[in-house]
Amino acid sequence: MQISLYQKNLADWTGSIIAVGLLEGQIQEQLSLLEEICDYDSLLTHVEEKDFSAKAGELIKLEILGKSLEKIILIGLGKPEALSIDDLREGAALASRASIGSKGKIGILFPWEPFNPISASKAVAEAMRLSIFKDLRFQSEPKPQNNPQSIDLIGLPESNHNIIKEVDPICSGVELARELVAAPPNELTPAALAEKAVEIAKKFKWNYKILNRKECEKEGMGAYLAVSQGSDLEPQFIHLTYKPNGQIKRRIAMVGKGLTFDSGGYNLKVGASQIEMMKYDMGGSAAVIGAARAIGELAPVDTEVHFIVAACENMVNGSAVHPGDIIKASNGTTIEINNTDAEGRLTLADALIYACKLEPDAIVDLATLTGACVIALGEEIAGLWVESDELANELKDASSACGEKLWRMPLQASYKEGLKSMLADIKNTGPRSGGSITAALFLKEFISNGIKWAHIDIAGTCWTDKDRGIDPAGATGFGVRTLVNWACKSNPDIEK
């Protein structure tokens, strides 16, 4: 998809379809901009006949209205006083989906004025591309959809063309994350995930390590290895390192939960626990690896980035960990496993300890960790646990700039009582109430003093069963764009 900015006279624009974003109460005024490229009177008549009022999400298509145009798509953006950049994203996604099957150039004419042109152009360009992603890899006779190939964002300064160049690597990272999450577990094994990570490292000439079981044993990673011991597939501990040219002013680590399949172990997932969907329990690692793909192209200035994933399966066999087992993490902490289906936090424990040994300024982990977070925040908002206000603000700025929603949750210290074990230093789960908070408190136990840390629970946001905003049904790639914005915040062209 080729996306360009067009600021010349609209009468000189050549294309077959134009999508116009309209506001309630301003329809006639806004449509007057089209007088030079279509039969304006006929257009108004059609709008009245369709009873179009520009309510948010409303869409109509009007065929062949004169001159070179074949179609006009009108999209409602809602009330002008409530217009947000998220409304532009939603409108762009509708326009892109409505244009599937069209061969000519498409123009997007939205009310840009209230917004920073860099923010608006990037938001709409990303939405146009990401909303029509389709994964055809596993169909025996795939029928590719005819996506629009050429799009002009009309009325935006052409001097901002550099920001459009950033859209391709970012969207490529999101699309990679979507493909990783959507891949079935017989295809995306821990080894396959490691291979994809190594492919990225080699492409950008980064340093990397892939630790096998014996190497993890030498590191004392008893928590991670306990989860993996019920699977015939070898665990793969992944570590990629991006180092910028010039002075390094900041060092950060991104840690992703990498359960390529989670049966629940002996606390087997049954009934509504959707065991058939547990391929997406590596959504955190997909976000981290997708971010690595984008960061390789965007090359953050002055920031060193570490990408860490403890990849494995949680399966059941004669060697699998038992409920009630006591294991030891690589920092010496003993853990009583009172639920084998709370395995992600065990793999993350050793991954976070490993990350802390690198002495970064900050660590962010992403994980499909708890159903409790889904109950609390639903499927559009991820939970954010963080003590540092500075890091919280960095992540909230990074997420709001790209439309990924985070909600800061409490690290209520008193809830740690629920993790007390009679025999070990800590249990891996607490009581049912406050489950997402106790999960975050468990992870906090493995963070070294002086290192800023944030935990993002993406259990609800990494998958959608139906089209939702810029996300088509399936894997969303949630978290990639937030991580990229956070890592690249010093880059001159990256939106702050």
UniProtKB/Swiss-Prot annotation:
Keywords: Aminopeptidase, Cytoplasm, Hydrolase, Manganese, Metal-binding, Protease. Mn(2+) 1 binds at D262, D341, E343. Its EC number is 3.4.11.1, 3.4.11.10. Mn(2+) 2 binds at K257, D262, D281, E343. Its cofactor is Mn(2+). Disulfide bonds: none annotated. GO terms for cellular component: cytoplasm. It comes from the Bacteria. The active site is at K269, R345. GO terms for molecular function: manganese ion binding; metalloaminopeptidase activity. It catalyses: Release of an N-terminal amino acid, Xaa-|-Yaa-, in which Xaa is preferably Leu, but may be other amino acids including Pro although not Arg or Lys, and Yaa may be Pro. Amino acid amides and methyl esters are also readily hydrolyzed, but rates on arylamides are exceedingly low; Release of an N-terminal amino acid, preferentially leucine, but not glutamic or aspartic acids. NCBIfam families: PRK00913.1-2 (NF002073), PRK00913.2-3 (NF002076). Presumably involved in the processing and regular turnover of intracellular proteins. Catalyzes the removal of unsubstituted N-terminal amino acids from various peptides. This is Probable cytosol aminopeptidase. The gene is pepA.
